């Protein structure tokens, strides 16, 4: 890094990036040269891949990974690739979850030729999202004592993984590892293909779970995906609702619901403030003070509290993601601050689960934060239909702000429906 580490830039999260590329493939609509006009760019032809990290120990983290995977598919992902891991039951769960939701998206399995050295790094949490259990590390350490430092057994393990992925109906595999030669890839693919008829024999020796690990689905006797997989959410208990969240839900219904009387009144209030900059600044300062004290508000002007169960993603998520967590958390802790900061999305999950709204985490799409609204009133932008939540229809409250930019000409493109063929 030049004179220190550069600041992270999170203008788009992974779901938003997939959504953008999908729109590019359709022909992206952009502002035209003349004010008030648009132009459509020539369609691109990207094959869109998206990742999922199923090797999570807790319910919250695992289900959030599956939910975000679903969001990526709805946003336009053409295939899914897994993070590397060594628990075949978790690999299979990726396909079982997609089947339970009616998706037939191809899934690529990750085959990493794991050495003892790389295993030690991953076992200690040195590669976020990559899990190597103590049991597997002990095996790798013993294998490293062989004359070839365990290479033959590593290649054999990789070939067995190829065979199992083929048997479980995966669309393909990604083979990786350090210092592999062309001959090694040939050996893995050829041997794995030859062993494919015996793939079930290899499952037990490729199943390295974690202590007290949560699984979304019961064990499969056949290790195959059924066309009638049950939605795992239906098996989850709701849990208790935090009092603070219950109060915010009540407040939202009274003040922020689009058809409420208070909403109409607030629209008129902020419309009037538009004509008085000094009063608007005072009002904005008071709003920011309240929201900063209660939620850690960063004054982005395009508030996502409604979308994230009143846990501000700008303040609480290290990557400011609005559509779910990254894949780097472990045991509920943030990848960036693993010893001091809990993953913001764990609490968001618990809150929405307590109110029976988990579908918001897998079906809802939150557009990118509108940077042009930074340091402006988030409440004003909401009530005057300037932020990402603005509906496509004309202002139903009759409190038109008089600003042509207050209401977008059309809503963001809806996420596509599940693939069924």
Which ranges hold each PLM region?
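Charge-patterned, long linear interaction tracts outside catalytic cores
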Residues: 163-188
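Active-site glycine-rich loop that binds ribose-phosphate moieties when present
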Residues: 59-75
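Active-site pocket-lining/capping segments in soluble small-molecule metabolic enzymes
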Residues: 8-59, 96, 100-161, 179, ...
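Conserved, mostly hydrophobic/aromatic
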Residues: 72, 76, 109, 173
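Catalytic beta/alpha-barrel core
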Residues: 78-87, 176
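Extended, intrinsically disordered, low-complexity segments
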Residues: 18, 23-32, 179, 197-281, ...
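Metallocofactor- and cofactor-centric catalytic cores in central/energy metabolism, strongly enriched
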Residues: 277-403
């Amino acid at each position: 890094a030049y004179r220190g580490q550069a600041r992270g830039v999170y203008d788009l999260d992974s779901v938003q990036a997939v959504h953008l590329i999908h729109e590019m493939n359709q022909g992206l609509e952009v502002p035209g040269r003349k004010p008030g006009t648009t132009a459509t760019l020539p369609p691109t032809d990207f094959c869109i891949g998206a990742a999922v990290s199923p090797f999570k120990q807790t319910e919250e983290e695992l289900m959030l990974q599956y939910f975000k995977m679903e969001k990526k598919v709805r946003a336009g992902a053409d295939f899914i690739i897994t993070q590397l891991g060594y628990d075949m039951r978790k690999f299979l769960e990726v396909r079982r979850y997609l089947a339970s939701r009616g998706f037939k998206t191809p899934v690529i399995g990750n085959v990493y030729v794991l050495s003892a050295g790389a295993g030690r790094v991953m076992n200690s949490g040195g590669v976020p999202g990559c899990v190597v259990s103590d049991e597997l590390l002990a095996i790798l350490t013993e294998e490293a004592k062989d004359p070839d430092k365990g290479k033959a057994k590593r290649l054999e393990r990789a070939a067995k993984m190829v065979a199992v992925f083929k048997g479980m109906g995966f669309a393909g595999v990604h083979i990786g590892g350090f210092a592999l030669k062309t001959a090694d890839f040939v050996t893995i693919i050829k041997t794995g293909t030859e062993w494919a008829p015996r793939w079930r024999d290899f499952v037990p020796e490729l199943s390295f779970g974690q202590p007290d690990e949560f699984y979304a689905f019961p064990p499969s006797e056949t290790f195959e995906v059924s066309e009638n997989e049950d939605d795992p959410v239906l098996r989850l208990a709701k849990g208790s609702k935090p009092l603070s969240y219950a109060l915010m839900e009540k407040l939202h219904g009274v003040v922020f619901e689009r058809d409420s009387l208070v909403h109409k009144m607030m629209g008129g209030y902020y419309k009037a403030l538009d004509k008085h900059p000094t009063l608007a600044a005072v009002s904005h300062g008071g709003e920011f003070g309240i929201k900063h004290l209660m939620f850690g508000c960063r004054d982005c002007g395009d508030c996502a509290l409604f979308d994230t169960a009143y846990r501000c993603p700008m303040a609480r998520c290290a990557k400011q993601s609005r559509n779910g967590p990254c894949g780097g958390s472990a045991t509920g802790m943030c990848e960036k601050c693993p010893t001091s900061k809990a993953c913001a999305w764990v609490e968001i999950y618990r809150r929405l689960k307590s109110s029976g709204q988990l579908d918001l985490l897998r079906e809802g799409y939150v557009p990118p934060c509108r940077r042009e609204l930074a340091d402006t009133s988030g409440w004003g932008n909401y009530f005057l239909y300037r932020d990402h939540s603005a509906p496509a229809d004309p202002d139903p409250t009759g409190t038109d702000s008089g600003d042509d930019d207050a209401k977008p000409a059309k809503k963001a493109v809806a996420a596509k429906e599940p693939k069924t063929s």
